[in-house]
Amino acid sequence: MWFSKTNFPVEGKTALIVGASQGIGVNLAERLYEKNCSTILVARTESKLQHQIQNIKEKYPESSAKISYAVADVSNYDECTRLWRTIDPADPDILFCCAGSSIPKLFQDLTKVDIESGIDINYKTVINVVHTGFKHALSNNTDNLEPHNFKKRSVVLFSSVVSFFPFIGYSQYAPMKSAIESLSIILRQELSPYNYRVTCVFPGNFQSEGFEEEQKTKPDITKKIEGPSNPIPGDECARLIIDQLDKGYDSITTDFIGWFLGCSVLGISSPRQWGFFQILVSFIVSLIAPIANWFINRDIKNSFKKTKKE
């Protein structure tokens, strides 16, 4: 697949981007609009959406595409149903589910609000939008087309590298991102007969408002295990994602460490990226993982001992 770049044509298409008031959602909107792909930005705050649309139009005045927005809290199922009815004439070809938020804390420090927002923002926003969108497509099949005659659509879900390697500090976030990976596998099986392509993205650290917020609550032990981080620019992250989609990959990482960690959890149903090399790396990881895990657990125990003394 790596030599082909014709698997994700966007010119003349319409993309619905959920979680597009900031971060990677905006970066993707810019990339797509630049490629003459009409975009519909979705988020909860209208003023932010209006601001982003104005910036994108000013940045790419040559684009012939349309850009608009829809205000919706997609963690609410009924609002998702309303969303699809509102944008019905557009009938998006591509759906990006980018909404997400991490609040890194020790489990004992999480609040009820933290836990509920983790479920709402990181999981319900995805399953609600995809489910209502698919049901909407089925209800619009007034010509009684056979599943294989449905128009081609793409669904791109955003998980995280922490779904490959969950560790201390991410209990509010990582389990939901693992759920997104599982959901992508099931959707690929259930929606592909209807001409849906389902892709799961596992981004590493990239520059965004969310990344800056994470640093405010991230425990020291989490930072130590994570190691020094040099987040890539958000627009570079978006470029990599679209490039990998174009090459036909349906399991996408945005940096080497993400690809490496993904090798440790190849599984049965997950699509692969440079699969032969992943098998080799997976074998190596299986040998060194117990050693690495011993050091991680040692550091965690020492961290709690230090905290107790203080």
UniProtKB/Swiss-Prot annotation:
Any GO MF annotation of the entry:
NADPH binding
Q: Which residues bind NADPH?
A: 19, 21, 23, 44, 48, 73
Q: Which domain of life is it from?
A: Eukaryota
What EC number(s) does its UniProt record assign?
A: 1.1.1.102
Q: How does it sit in the membrane?
A: Single-pass membrane protein
Question: Family per UniProt?
Answer: Belongs to the short-chain dehydrogenases/reductases (SDR) family.
What protein name applies here?
3-ketodihydrosphingosine reductase TSC10
